[in-house]
A protein has these predicted regions:
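Interfacial segments of alpha-helical transmembrane regions
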Residues: 17-25, 84-112
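Structural signal for the C-terminal ends of transmembrane alpha-helices
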Residues: 2-7, 87-96, 157-164, 210-216
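Hydrophobic alpha-helical transmembrane segments
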Residues: 73-94, 149-154, 161
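Aromatic-anchored segments of alpha-helical transmembrane domains
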Residues: 30-33, 107-114, 177-187
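N-terminal transmembrane-helix/juxtamembrane module of multi-pass inner/ER membrane proteins
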Residues: 1-81, 119-134
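Alpha-helical transmembrane segments of multi-pass membrane proteins, especially transporters
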Residues: 52, 101-106, 171, 200-201
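Membrane-water interface at transmembrane helix exits
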Residues: 35, 51, 113-121, 158, ...
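Membrane-embedded catalytic cores of phosphoryl/pyrophosphoryl-handling enzymes
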Residues: 129-243
Length: 243
């Protein structure tokens, strides 16, 4: 009988050093400080000027693209994307540990943006000045959740879906372009400041770096051991085909 865990190779990720924890905390603190500093400067200044400068470059095609990105990478859309990839890994490719690694890593990067939103509580850009194309209000401008998820998705693809150095390099380049496009779409729509999307890239990275040593040193070894023991139990209880 085929071993049930043969399609579920261990998913210990790169960068397992515990030193990543203080590094991630420092990066998080720096990112939050950036947000608080930008908030203290008010809505006027270079941050708003860049948003306003994009108004003249709007076109039906770019507006359609930015609107699609806004919908697809909304909180509900993010959950669908995350669930789809995890189910694909776990059920179709029979890699449950990879599914858990991907889902938890992306979630760590994405949800870390909520820490910034709560602490900074920055008001959205004035829609009248940016001529915002969608309605966004409230004190949750810093950082951008859309951009944070895009960055976290790239981290997940590089660390879990790619396997060789070349694959990771190519995935990183393509993913970097993707994250920048999502970030620019938030500015194009007039619902975020440039510092918001920059902070998203930083705080998402901080969340991923915080999670990696926890996954590699505490969680993955235990899950791998449970999976192997469970697979052996099923294998040993299978009837002998010669009986």
């Amino acid at each position: 009988m085929k071993h049930l865990t043969s399609g579920s190779p261990t998913r210990r990720l790169p960068w397992r050093s515990w030193w990543l924890l203080p590094v991630s905390v420092i990066l998080l603190a720096l990112t939050v400080s950036l947000g608080l500093l930008a908030k203290s400067a008010g809505s006027s200044g270079p941050d708003l000027d860049l948003d306003v400068s994009l108004i003249k470059d709007r076109s039906p095609a770019l507006t359609a693209l930015a609107t699609i990105i806004n919908t697809v990478f909304s909180p509900a859309g993010n959950l669908v994307i995350l669930a789809f990839v995890c189910l694909l890994l776990a059920v179709v490719l029979r890699r449950p540990l990879a599914a858990l690694a991907f889902g938890s890593t992306v979630a760590a990067g994405w949800l870390s943006s909520e820490i910034g939103k709560i602490i900074v509580a920055r008001q959205r850009p004035p829609g009248a000045m940016t001529q915002a194309l969608i309605v966004e209000s409230g004190h949750d401008s810093f950082p951008s959740g859309h951009t944070a998820f895009a960055a976290a998705l790239v981290w997940g693809a590089v660390l879990i879906l790619a396997h060789t150095r070349i694959q990771r390099a190519v995935t990183g380049v393509i993913g970097g372009v993707f994250a920048v496009v999502v970030a620019l779409s938030r500015l194009y729509l007039g619902v975020h400041y440039p510092s918001d999307v920059a902070g998203s890239l930083l705080i998402s990275t901080a969340g991923v770096l915080f999670w990696l040593p926890l996954w590699n040193n505490l969680i993955e070894p235990r899950l791998d051991r449970i999976t192997r023991v469970g697979g052996k139990s099923v294998h040993s209880s299978a009837p002998d085909p010669e009986e």
